Amino acid sequence: MSRYRGPRLRITRRLGDLPGLTRKAAKRSYPPGQHGQARRKRSEYAIRLEEKQKLRFNYGVSERQLVRYVKKARAQEGSTGTNLLKLLENRLDNVCFRIGFGPTVPGARQLVNHGHVTVNGRVTDIASYQCKAGDVIAIRERKCSKLLAEANLQFPGLANVPPHLELDKPKLSAKVIGRAEREWVALEINELLVVEYYSRKV
């Protein structure tokens, strides 16, 4: 399944607030479609699927990528759900979003893909790069790159930079000073349901 490029508010109407996907708020509180206002009892599978979709759309990853992250999370020590969230939080595109270089995760990914971002002084255009403690993420020394980042920093997607990231606004750079913790994930999600969803599939 490829990355979603359709109407974003349609997704937030169905799944709720997704800060990584869009800043806009849905005007209608019920899901889209002809039967959106109908009250139906959802099955356990539907609830788990919805939580999985939240994760996929918020972080902008494909189904194949998410399966890969679930396998990695299982191989690590500790809670699979927490490990999964940490892996997604440490993606370069998400880190750029969290520090305000991009207005959304897709916006931050475009910044990375177009070569506007450096990691430890080297241009890195791989959005899935796993940031680790000690990494310095900065905007490339080009006028167009700086203008883009400065414009986005004036209106960041989220109000607070998480404590494991240290932003230096004047230098347009940030340092990863620790590990992403569960409590600083901006998305409202039950990651255990995502793990349960994949328990028989992966």
Curated annotation (Swiss-Prot):
Signal sequence bounds: none
Taxonomic superkingdom: Bacteria
Pfam families: Ribosomal_S4, S4
Region of interest: Disordered: 15-42
Molecular function per GO: rRNA binding; structural constituent of ribosome
Gene Ontology, cellular component aspect: small ribosomal subunit
Keyword tags: Ribonucleoprotein, Ribosomal protein, RNA-binding, rRNA-binding
CDD domains for this protein: S4 (cd00165)
Domain S4 RNA-binding: 90-152
GO biological process terms, semicolon-separated: ribosomal small subunit biogenesis; translation
PROSITE patterns on file: RIBOSOMAL_S4, S4
UniProt cross-references to InterPro entries, sorted A to Z: Ribosomal_uS4, Ribosomal_uS4_bac-type, Ribosomal_uS4_CS, Ribosomal_uS4_N, S4_RNA-bd, S4_RNA-bd_sf
Family to which this protein belongs: Belongs to the universal ribosomal protein uS4 family.
Function: One of the primary rRNA binding proteins, it binds directly to 16S rRNA where it nucleates assembly of the body of the 30S subunit. With S5 and S12 plays an important role in translational accuracy.
NCBIfam families in UniProt: PRK05327.1 (NF003717), rpsD_bact (TIGR01017)
Complex formation: Part of the 30S ribosomal subunit. Contacts protein S5. The interaction surface between S4 and S5 is involved in control of translational fidelity.
Protein name: Small ribosomal subunit protein uS4
Organism: Synechococcus sp. (strain CC9311)
Gene it is expressed from: rpsD
